[in-house]
Amino acid sequence: LRFMLKSEGLPYEFLHLPSIKHEKKLPTVLSKEEVWRLLKSCQLLKHKILIGLLYGCGLRCGEVRAVRLQDMDFDRLQLKVVQGKGKKDRYVPLSKHLIRGLKTYIDAEKPETYLFNGQPVGRAGGDFDSRYSARGVQWAVKQACKAAGITKDVCVNTLRHTFATHLLEDGLDIISLKNL
């Protein structure tokens, strides 16, 4: 309504609309045992590594899709997250266990630019987005949950919330967590 009044050149400052109240639900968090079952239930190494990065590094969907081979530093045990939310770069730690899986995956799949390759978009000869699709990431998480027998409403961001919750439970201070 404000936009319409403003675009018509009419005064809109007097207009006070009530804001819509949204339910504030606590995020779903998986137990450590559920995360373990989730990882073990993955049929494809690609999905196991994908979920491992989402949980083990606390990555967002767009961030895991944008991981390039050059962003991984196995010597320093870290992953550079380029242009994450807020267009900020940051480094996140990689566990030795995850690095072992990443090396196996890279040797087997031979990705070129992005760690997780995508599919051609549209018809044959259409545009090609070399990144794995957001829907593909969501599907992999849902399939793993189904196979693991997890009945909670789990989405990609649930793994990020779970990552943060487990770090807090293990004694990491909130300021350090904020920087991850």
Region locations from a protein language model:
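Conserved catalytic core of the tyrosine transesterase superfamily
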Residues: 1-180
